[in-house]
């Protein structure tokens, strides 16, 4: 039916199914032409409303449209725990609505939550590939739980220190005996390195999910590491070498740390080499006393430069040169006098001042009276302006 025929049928009020079937089989170009042939705004609005309410077209044959299947949600660890331990013998006589709270209490204190997370992830991976019908959950747990030494439903309450009782209302309750030895023991393989792929490989070896094909190009998304419990084991692990195969992130971090350590070592070594070079150069400039040990070289990876350093040459000159007996930079103030009241002018030469000081009357060169063991009656030197008592 062409567009003109469709417009003519609209005038005779055709059935809704016929209109929908016509609109579903139109192409985009035909729909544009159809809107151009309907000039009235009310008719265009009615056609637009009909297009919005159309059901999706179901195509047959090789042109059939198939919507992409959404990824299924992974099985929750608690749900897996509940599915396995709902068969505890003490719970069989009670409906599920009265057991939900009890199983929740068991889950809160269960020591094997990490193992349940691994098991449910492994089963979810199998289910997503081969389907739920070919991967029964109860069969999966019946294979993997005994392998991981998980407590069986028949012995779970006794192993973990739980006891079941009936309250006044006739409902089941559980109580935990924290003082019992079994309450403090984790039943799972806490000392085993385990991954999702390890679990899948084991159940497949037991004949479960034989059609499942693991992707060899991807690593396991979840890994349960080894639990170190003894001091000797901790010391052995501390001295162990780095694993040959490490994640890409760990390899990048290790390489970055090595580069930083190398830069720090080069920096420290360079400063030490420069300091040793300066010390050796100082020894070269001033060999020291005869017989004093002087190393030929210092253990340093850097080459030593034996050229004299001006700073140390000047420093050695300051300490080795005699102290001069002149004051070229000293200036006398006007009207200055010596101790014996001898006037001194700021124009007097320094050489003349040395003579004045040497020939001053107060200057005494005989100090025999002050030597050790001198006569106590010795005559002290006299001064012109001071009378001896």
Curated annotation (Swiss-Prot):
The places in or outside the cell where this protein is found are:
Nucleus
Record function comment: Mating type proteins are sequence specific DNA-binding proteins that act as master switches in fungal differentiation by controlling gene expression in a cell type-specific fashion. Transcriptional activator that induces the transcription of alpha-specific genes.
Q: Its encoding gene is what?
A: MAT1
Q: Name one Pfam family in it.
A: MATalpha_HMGbox
Q: From the UniProt annotation, which stretches of this protein bind DNA?
A: 70-127
Q: Give the protein's recorded name.
A: Mating-type protein MAT-1
An example of a Gene Ontology BP annotation on this entry? positive regulation of mating-type specific transcription, DNA-templated
CC per GO annotation:
nucleus
| Gene Ontology molecular functions | DNA binding, bending
Q: What is the species of this protein? A: Alternaria alternata
The family note in this entry says: Belongs to the MATALPHA1 family.
UniProt keywords, alphabetically: DNA-binding, Nucleus, Transcription, Transcription regulation
């Amino acid at each position: 039916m062409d567009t003109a025929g469709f417009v003519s049928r609209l005038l005779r009020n055709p059935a809704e199914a016929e209109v929908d079937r016509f609109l579903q089989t139109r192409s985009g170009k035909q729909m544009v032409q159809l809107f151009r042939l309907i000039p009235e705004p009310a008719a265009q609005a009615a056609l637009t409303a009909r297009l919005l309410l159309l059901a999706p077209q179901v195509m047959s044959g090789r042109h059939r449209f198939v919507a992409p299947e959404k990824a299924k949600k992974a099985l929750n660890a608690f749900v897996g725990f509940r599915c396995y331990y709902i068969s505890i013998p003490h719970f069989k006589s009670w409906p599920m609505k009265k057991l939900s709270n009890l199983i929740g209490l068991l889950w809160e204190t269960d020591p094997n939550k990490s193992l349940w997370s691994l098991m449910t992830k492994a089963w979810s991976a199998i289910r997503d590939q081969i389907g739920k019908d070919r991967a029964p959950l109860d069969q999966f747990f019946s294979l993997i739980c005994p392998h991981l030494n998980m407590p069986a439903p028949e012995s779970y309450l006794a192993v973990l220190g739980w006891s079941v009782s009936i309250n006044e209302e006739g409902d089941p309750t559980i109580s935990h005996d924290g003082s019992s030895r079994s309450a403090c023991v984790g039943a799972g393989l806490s000392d085993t390195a385990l991954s999702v792929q390890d679990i899948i490989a084991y159940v497949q070896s037991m004949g479960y999910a034989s059609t499942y094909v693991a992707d060899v190009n991807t690593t396991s998304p979840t890994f349960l590491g080894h639990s170190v419990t003894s001091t000797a084991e901790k010391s052995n692990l501390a001295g162990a070498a780095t694993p040959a195969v490490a994640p890409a992130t760990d390899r990048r971090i290790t390489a970055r740390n090595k580069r930083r350590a190398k830069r720090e070592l080069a920096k420290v070594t360079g400063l030490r080499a420069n300091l040793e070079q300066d010390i050796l150069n100082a020894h070269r400039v001033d060999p020291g006393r005869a017989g004093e040990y002087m190393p030929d070289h210092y253990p340093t990876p850097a080459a030593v430069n034996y050229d004299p350093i001006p700073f140390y040459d000047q420093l050695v000159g300051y300490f080795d040169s005699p102290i001069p007996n002149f004051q070229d930079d000293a200036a006398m103030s006007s009207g200055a006098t010596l101790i014996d009241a001898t006037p001194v002018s700021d124009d007097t030469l320094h050489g003349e001042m040395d003579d004045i000081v040497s020939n001053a009357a107060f200057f005494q060169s005989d100090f025999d009276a002050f030597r050790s063991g001198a006569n106590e009656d010795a005559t002290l030197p006299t001064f012109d302006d001071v009378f001896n008592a």
